[in-house]
Amino acid sequence: MQQTLADTDSAVSSSRPHYRRTLDLVHTRLLPRTYAEIGVAGGGTLSLVLPGTAAVAIDPKPRIRRPVPRSAKVFSMTSDEFFAAHDLRRLLDDRPVDVGFIDGMHLFEFALRDFINLERHCGPDSVLLLHDCYPVSEAAASREHAESMGNWSGDVWKVIACLKEHRQDLDVSVADIRPSGLGIVTGLDPTSTVLADRFDEICRRYVPLEYGFLAEGKEEKLNRVDGDPRTVLSLLPGRPYRRGSRALLRAGRDARRRRKRLAHRVMRIRRGAGRRLRRRVREARRRLRLR
């Protein structure tokens, strides 16, 4: 019988934190000076950026609907195109990436390349986060994305296995949060060329690797940890990257959201008024023709 996303190999509990809540925790506790995001979609995660954080976001087809910071620089291109044409550190005022979030193409080789490119612009105290590293089922972890799939995570989980094998200098964990886990990597080394030098060799080994690799010892092979706030915080740097009142920064972000909602409300009112006016004009013209 064909497996579906509902046929999970572990119970997906609604009590587990959602990944956006965990990202919000990272932002509010670490107060990053700089933030880079690969895979923007509707802007839900980019909207979590606090005032004062310089942000760069990359997506070939961003469809931003959320209130993202005005200072955020959004590049409508693939991540490969971006890193070939731009100096990320320069875009961040010559500062390293404090926090990076990878949620782009859900295929191993793309996610690994994104990791390599982001690490080059990090510092030793930076944090890289990778979405979709703890797939809920074999169907969700397929390299083929069927339109009927909901939370497709692809084979990004292989990046964790790869880092454990080839980059034992890193601290790698996967927080078991909804919907499909969040990889947390610290101890980064921007001077390392191990992954880039072995990229083709690594891809030959990992791209064809089957989900059955996780059949026994999935938690150990992916360094699973609980996704509760206390556990996640224990994996992050102990000090924030900058000073600031968390309450005031969150208030500033909330104000940005309120302005966005107000702007949408005004736009809807204007559109409604425009439609009513056009209906009245059409009705007046119809009456004139009947005279």
Region spans (language model):
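A short alpha-helical cap/connector motif
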Residues: M1-F101, M105-L129, C133-R291
